[in-house]
């Protein structure tokens, strides 16, 4: 379905200066192939927490919610806002938990912002979710300019080197952070732990697909302005396994019978709509595709809000 833009989102250019476009893939591939020459120095005395199966799908042997802390930073007539943190594989993850008032045990949406967008900058999405009666946990991703420190999951060269050593690549650590965030929400008695979905914008959309594929407790995956990475690992076996394990398309088959819902704008210059559609076309039912005229990329917009709200109501049942 195509919908005309009713208004231009004033934040649509927030992350324009970041792009993992197909024009940069040749550079990334060159770095991956260079890294493939690094000797394998896996420390056999320390078993990795992660493993890759025969389909190159990532899994973790266990997940540990460590040192969770909560600070109330805002309390209004309509919602409360808490800053939460927890330790997660070498760093401390920070997030903002917004809980609507006058809603008993609300469903929750885990929000994963686009590249260069912090949890605070993504507040329009949290505002909308709260107005619809949903809580939201918006995470600062690793190395994305927010409070959560660490190597960026966009650094594929360092990630591949870590993979070959048997360390935790940043790409895996980012997914681990999200899944531990899910576990944190499960521990909250004031939230509906049986009604949690994940929503990602641009870069965060890729993480959302992977996280939903790995954690069956997520009720659905919502993806705004995202696509496959489209990396080609050549003929190197290790590179193929690593690239497949971080590629969202690998995890599409793990999402059904839960729903994948995607939103994209026709004139998106950061991730062209054809790239987003390729991810959608590779997914199985149930799924839904919404496209709109305009160039909004990777942020909340009133343009797609009614469709997002309707899909959330369908998933959560309220």
What are these regions (language model features)?
Residues 278-318:
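C-terminal catalytic histidine-bearing segment of alpha/beta-hydrolase fold enzymes
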Residues 232-283:
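The feature captures the conserved acid-bearing segment of alpha/beta-hydrolase catalytic domains
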Residues 112, 139-141, 224, 292:
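Alpha/beta-hydrolase
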Residues 1-40:
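Secretory targeting signatures
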């Amino acid at each position: 379905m195509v919908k005309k833009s009713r208004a231009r989102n004033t934040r649509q250019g927030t992350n324009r200066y970041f792009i993992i476009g197909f024009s940069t893939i040749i550079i990334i591939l060159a770095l991956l192939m260079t890294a493939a020459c690094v000797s394998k120095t896996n420390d056999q005395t320390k078993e990795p927490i992660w493993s890759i199966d025969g389909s190159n799908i990532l899994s973790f042997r266990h997940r540990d919610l460590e040192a969770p802390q909560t600070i109330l930073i805002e309390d209004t007539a309509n919602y409360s806002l808490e800053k939460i943190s927890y330790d997660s594989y070498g760093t401390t993850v920070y997030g903002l938990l917004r809980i609507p008032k006058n809603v008993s045990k609300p469903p929750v949406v885990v929000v994963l912002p686009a590249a260069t967008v912090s949890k605070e900058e993504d507040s329009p999405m949290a505002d909308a979710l709260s107005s619809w009666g949903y809580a939201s946990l918006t995470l600062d991703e690793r190395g994305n300019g927010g409070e959560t420190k660490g190597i960026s999951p966009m650094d594929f060269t360092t990630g591949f080197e870590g993979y070959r050593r048997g360390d935790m690549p940043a790409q895996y650590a980012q997914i681990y952070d999200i899944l531990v965030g899910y576990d944190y929400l499960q521990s909250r008695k004031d939230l509906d732990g049986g009604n949690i979905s994940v929503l990602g914008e641009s870069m965060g959309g890729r993480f959302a697909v992977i996280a939903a594929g790995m954690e069956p407790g997520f009720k659905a995956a919502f993806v705004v302005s995202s696509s496959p990475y489209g990396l080609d690992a050549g003929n190197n076996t290790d590179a193929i396994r690593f690239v497949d394990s971080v590629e969202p398309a690998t995890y599409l088959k793990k999402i059904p019978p839960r729903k994948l819902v995607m939103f994209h704008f026709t004139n998106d210059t950061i991730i062209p709509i054809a790239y987003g559609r390729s991810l959608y076309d590779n997914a199985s039912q149930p799924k839904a595709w919404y496209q709109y005229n305009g160039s909004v990329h990777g942020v909340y917009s009133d343009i797609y809000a009614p469709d997002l709200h309707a899909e959330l109501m369908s998933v959560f049942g309220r």
